[in-house]
Amino acid sequence: MSASADSLGAAAALDKYGDEDIFSLLIRYGLYVGALFQFVCISAAVLMENNPDGQSNPESGEVTEREGEPVRTRLHKIRKLEKKKRR
């Protein structure tokens, strides 16, 4: 019986995951909460419609093409104005 008790004692000494402190519990449950938050965000991005009215917001930062003015020229003008504002 003493050989069995010694082997159980040695196995208990090698088990480093048996005792969990507050920090490891906090990390484990924090990772679960983070994974749940990521799942909710990704599912919301996939399932939600983009502008249900079909109208685009002109102040959203998107660059659209005007009549006769290509998008590239507008981007250049926007960058030039932003650079000028920084001076």
Swiss-Prot record:
- Chain intervals for the UniProt region annotation (Disordered): 51-87
One Pfam entry name: UPF0239
User: Which UniProt keywords are present, listed alphabetically?
Assistant: Membrane, Transmembrane, Transmembrane helix
Identify its membrane topology class: Single-pass membrane protein
Membrane-crossing residue ranges in chain numbering? 25-47
Where in or outside the cell it occurs: the entry states: Membrane
Q: Which InterPro entries match?
A: UPF0239
Lineage top rank: taxon: Eukaryota
Does this entry carry the keyword Repeat? no
| Residue spans of biased composition, Basic and acidic residues class | 63-72
The signal peptide annotation in the UniProt record is none
| Basic residues bias: start-end ranges | 73-87
Q: Which GO terms describe its cellular component?
A: membrane
What the record says about family reads: Belongs to the UPF0239 family.
**Name the record gives this protein:** Protein anon-73B1
